[in-house]
């Protein structure tokens, strides 16, 4: 979604990213669909294709959503469709979530972050990832490799998704270890490895028996999802130098979980340490539980106090339904310009919503909040607000690693990479 507090450069960043569909001719929209927009203008009809679930850098997902309904007249240069990470033609990489700056049972020690299960259940920080798996078929000295669904000595449930050609079907749900492409590589077996009946055939009839080795493409550990695209690329004259290639694209849906990394826009990043039930999160005086709990010790030593201003101004903007576009270094206008703006907006929000606790003159910007487990108020007033928080690409699913045994360094006895 759009940020409540921004810099004013979000629209330019979205335009320069190249993910928006921008109209090149003025006219009227006749038809809008998920994959195309048809536009009529100057006596011509133009079809503008939209990108659907395409793999992007870092295995993320690119998708365009139409913004303007059919029947509307548009001008040249207007935005027709939002792309990846844009909302209404502006950069929209994160969400405005309710945050409290306070310690909580040590779970936000060393920049760790405590989050509410609402972010999981309501898919606030759920992302789509597309992974590409590929396999090639070569012509070996024993003969060409074959793509087939008839693989001997394999359990039937591993082959359940293959079609008659030996390739996984579109729309199949695949889990770790499932076979995506069935492939057999011919190889000559040693005399001793033949079965007795094969040896008899060779001795009596002189029939050469060749064995095949199973070289299937299997889904690696940690991979699971839905097959959204299959591409079989065949080049003319299949030889060793231009083999056939099969690409399988798998879409994965990842909710936010313990070990993922989140960050604000002030370098205030952290790892999620625990996901709490909604009823256990600290809650405000109007009964709303907070979504995230950040450590207040991450602010003074790093001197990125802008996050506190953003947090409080976001709270006012969320209640007043306003968006603010503030350039950095606005202290040049007058002394303490940021503080004056934030406090005046908080005061206005407390007046309009008839909630005096939003702006308390004794501790402006802070509020008394309650422990969700006991219902008792915390000792000190706490800064609460709606900053813009992003989920980063550093996800625990890509980083988790383990090994049972392997090579060690002689001196330090540490495992080698």
From Swiss-Prot:
Catalysis: reaction(s): RNA(n) + a ribonucleoside 5'-triphosphate = RNA(n+1) + diphosphate
Q: What family does the database annotate?
A: Belongs to the RNA polymerase beta chain family.
Instruction: Please give the name of this protein.
Output: DNA-directed RNA polymerase subunit beta
One GO cellular component term of this record is: DNA-directed RNA polymerase complex
Identify the main location: plastid
For this UniProt entry, the molecular function terms from Gene Ontology, in alphabetical order, are: DNA binding; DNA-directed RNA polymerase activity; ribonucleoside binding
Q: Which domain of life is it from?
A: Eukaryota
The places in or outside the cell where this protein is found are: Plastid, Chloroplast
What EC number(s) would the UniProt record show? 2.7.7.6
Q: Which organism is it from?
A: Saponaria officinalis (Common soapwort)
Output the PROSITE patterns linked to this UniProt entry: RNA_POL_BETA
On subunit structure and binding partners, the annotation says: In plastids the minimal PEP RNA polymerase catalytic core is composed of four subunits: alpha, beta, beta', and beta''. When a (nuclear-encoded) sigma factor is associated with the core the holoenzyme is formed, which can initiate transcription.
Q: Which UniProt keywords apply?
A: Chloroplast, DNA-directed RNA polymerase, Nucleotidyltransferase, Plastid, Transcription, Transferase
Give the protein's function: DNA-dependent RNA polymerase catalyzes the transcription of DNA into RNA using the four ribonucleoside triphosphates as substrates.
SUPFAM superfamilies of this UniProt entry? beta and beta-prime subunits of DNA dependent RNA-polymerase
Q: Which PANTHER family does this chain map to?
A: DNA-DIRECTED RNA POLYMERASE I SUBUNIT 2
Family matches, as Pfam families: RNA_pol_Rpb2_6
Record InterPro entries: DNA-dir_RNA_pol_su2, DNA-dir_RNAP_su2_dom, DNA-dir_RNAP_su2_hyb_sf, RNA_pol_bsu_CS
Q: Name one GO biological process term.
A: DNA-templated transcription
